[in-house]
Amino acid sequence: MKKIALVIAAMMVSLASHAQFEAGKAYVGASLSGLDLSYSGLTEGKLSVQGKVGYLLVDNIMATAQLSYEKQKDVPYVLSVGAGGRYYIVQNGLYLGASALFKHHKGYNDLLPSVQVGYSFFVSRTVTIEPELYYEQSFKNHSDYSQFGLRIGIGIYLFKDPTQN
């Protein structure tokens, strides 16, 4: 009897998690990196705050847009804007992401492709905690501006578009 109850519970959890990444839902998130959680040639004393919005175009595939602000020890600010996508590999929240970022600070502009792998831990039906590993590749100055690191974020999956089934 316990085995049957466990199988039924597992099926219910997998169905509930499938509903989290269905087409027509919107996403709003914010994340933090830095505090020695990232590395590049120039990131001593770096802190980065990022905002992201997204929309699930089809089940498990999200288009995203992002804006971020970085403060580094020797650089007054770095602003970046980007667009990309996420693919949820498995229904429990594991995802792969790719994006293109445009970074700017006084006297410096760069276009960086970025890849991410992360996990969406659902703490409620719509709210997630999202640890994410990322890599950003600078073509202008690889040794100083390419970086990899860890972001910790929070995400909110909003509505399901009523015009879709």
What do these predicted ranges mean?
Residues 1-25, 159-165:
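Cleavable N-terminal export/targeting peptides
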Residues 20-36:
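Transmembrane beta-strand segments of Gram-negative outer membrane beta-barrel proteins
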Residues 24-26, 43-49, 77-81, 109-113, ...:
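Residues that define the transmembrane beta-barrel architecture of outer-membrane proteins
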Residues 27-31, 121, 145-165:
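Outer-membrane beta-barrel "beta-signal"
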Residues 32-36, 100-101, 134-137:
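Extracytoplasmic loops and strand-loop junctions of Gram-negative outer membrane beta-barrel proteins
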Residues 35-52, 66:
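Surface-exposed strand-loop-strand hairpins of Gram-negative outer-membrane beta-barrel proteins
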Residues 36-42, 70-74, 104-107, 139-143:
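Outer-membrane beta-barrel domain signature
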Residues 54-133, 156:
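Gram-negative (and chloroplast) outer-membrane scaffold detector with strong preference
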